[in-house]
């Protein structure tokens, strides 16, 4: 069954998940997509965005595992001119770029604890602080996070903030592994 231009499936568990995803897409709540690597978490996040009231707004994805902590902070929240060596102009981070749309925080489990605290503040207050910036900037963003890890286990071992976990895991979605959907 051709569900969207990117998703084609006949798997009953996938069809059921996509039905749930379509139904929760209109919600403003944060979502957590958990699954093994390579199962299509970003495709599902994009599908949710395309079926939401924000569909005509930006969809911005960032892989939290791909950047070191200092660079990830600047990429997420932006930086002011002169904030650090090489910051020759203001930079709009991913949250500003996604304003009124959706941001996908891919592999959220790889985010360092200090940055998790800053992300939690953004989720609580709907505003960002640019690196080296003076004033907070309001943002209206739907957040979808993904992980291939057991985040609750990471919470238990002190590697992921419990408050952030519950703030992100408002609507949990789990993609079945590829080995369970051979069709």
Per-region residue spans from a language model:
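Nucleotide-binding/hydrolysis machinery
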Residues: 4-6, 10-15, 25-26, 52-57, ...
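Conserved post-Walker A coupling segment in P-loop NTPases
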Residues: 6, 19-85, 96-112, 140, ...
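Conserved catalytic/switch belt of AAA+ P-loop NTPases
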Residues: 81, 114-138, 148-156
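Conserved catalytic core of Hanks-type protein kinase domains
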Residues: 97, 122, 145, 167
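Loop/turn-to-beta-strand initiation segments
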Residues: 99-102, 118, 139-144, 161
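A short beta-strand-to-loop transition that corresponds to the Sensor-1 phosphate-sensing loop
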Residues: 107, 145-150
């Amino acid at each position: 069954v051709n569900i969207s231009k990117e998703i084609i499936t006949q798997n009953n568990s996938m069809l059921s998940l996509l039905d749930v995803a379509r139904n929760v897409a209109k919600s403003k709540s944060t979502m957590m997509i958990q699954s093994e690597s390579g199962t299509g978490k970003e495709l599902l996040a994009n599908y949710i965005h395309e079926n939401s009231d924000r569909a005509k707004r930006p969809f911005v994805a960032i892989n939290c595992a791909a950047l070191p902590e200092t660079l990830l902070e600047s990429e997420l929240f932006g930086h002011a001119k002169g904030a650090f060596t090489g910051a020759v102009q203001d930079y709009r981070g991913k949250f500003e770029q996604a304003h009124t749309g959706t941001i996908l925080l891919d592999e959220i489990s790889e985010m360092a604890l200090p940055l998790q605290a800053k992300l939690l503040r953004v989720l609580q207050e709907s505003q960002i602080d640019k690196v080296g910036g003076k004033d907070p900037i309001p943002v209206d963003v739907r957040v979808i996070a993904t992980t291939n890890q057991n985040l609750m286990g990471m919470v238990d071992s002190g590697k992921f903030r419990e408050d952030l976990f519950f703030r992100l895991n408002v609507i949990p979605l789990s993609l079945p592994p590829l080995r369970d959907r051979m069709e």
